[in-house]
Amino acid sequence: MAAGTAARKAAPVLEAPPQQEQLSHTKLSAEDTWNLQQERMYKMHRGHDSMHVEMILIFLCVLVIAQIVLVQWRQRHGRSYNLVTLLQMWVVPLYFTIKLYWWRFLSMWGMFSVITSYILFRATRKPLSGRTPRLVYKWFLLIYKLSYAFGVVGYLAIMFTMCGFNLFFKIKARDSMDFGIVSLFYGLYYGVMGRDFAEICSDYMASTIGFYSVSRLPTRSLSDNICAVCGQKIIVELDEEGLIENTYQLSCNHVFHEFCIRGWCIVGKKQTCPYCKEKVDLKRMISNPWERTHFLYGQILDWLRYLVAWQPVVIGIVQGIIYSLGLE
């Protein structure tokens, strides 16, 4: 009788510690959980200093070699480099989006891809419709302005968070910083995609019309009242104020529709006349300083292009080398 009572009293004592441990894990905050994971990671990698040095050296060597190969490829075969980079820019984020369940980015990516695919389809048709160039340049000019606005808003949100201005609006620093980073990434990513697709459409349309060729002379002569970008007649005179758009004249005396030449130079990254290939003076063509192409913005887009398109490839090569060498 006494032995049975002692056994019943001892049973709860043996089951109590796991229950307390389980409750303690459920009461951990997000910060405590993160600290616990860091402690486990530190214990796992303790004493592997030489191995970590080897992994860092492998990463740096692959990074330098990849940079040299990409630069040489871009200089020798720029067209194929741009096409492969654009394809990776388009596909690589889709993989990470599906893997990490970023449905908001996936919906925006899908909408942008559908509309841009339709625009690209219209731009590559032969014969080219007279309305297609205007449609193409208006779409990509809209993408350019929206991406630029998102980039500026994201940058300002990050700077305001770092300065502590988010406290005036009772916004958590993590929320405002996340908003700034996401907005900045959206602006830069779609800015890169829009500019690259606009360049492809510009080459196809201009060569189809016949007033422009990438490596040869124009196949058609240009009249004084014809736009070399869209091939349509110019109605508004140079000294007149148009209701929808004005007429621009370059330093080579060739005239164009406002939307056509803006899309050609600003969105399509073309710095030459569509007909005679003379260098375009953007400061003379665009008087508003806020609409001028910023070289720093273009460099940031190039950096993001490398980060999104080629950095995952470099990391994949490094992981393959590390796995083949047996480094953990």
UniProtKB/Swiss-Prot annotation:
Q: Which GO terms describe its biological process?
A: ERAD pathway
List cellular component terms (GO). Answer: endoplasmic reticulum membrane; Golgi membrane
The record describes its membrane topology as:
Multi-pass membrane protein
Which SUPFAM superfamilies is this protein grouped with? RING/U-box
Alphabetized UniProt keyword annotations: Membrane, Metal-binding, Transmembrane, Transmembrane helix, Zinc, Zinc-finger
Q: Where does the UniProt annotation locate this protein?
A: Membrane
Where does this protein chiefly localize? membrane
Q: Name one GO molecular function term.
A: zinc ion binding
**Where does the sequence pass through the membrane?**
51-71, 83-103, 104-121, 149-169, 180-200
Q: Where are the zinc fingers (RING-type)?
A: 227-277
By its UniProt entry, which Pfam families does this protein fall under?
zf-C3HC4
UniProt name for this protein:
RING finger protein 175
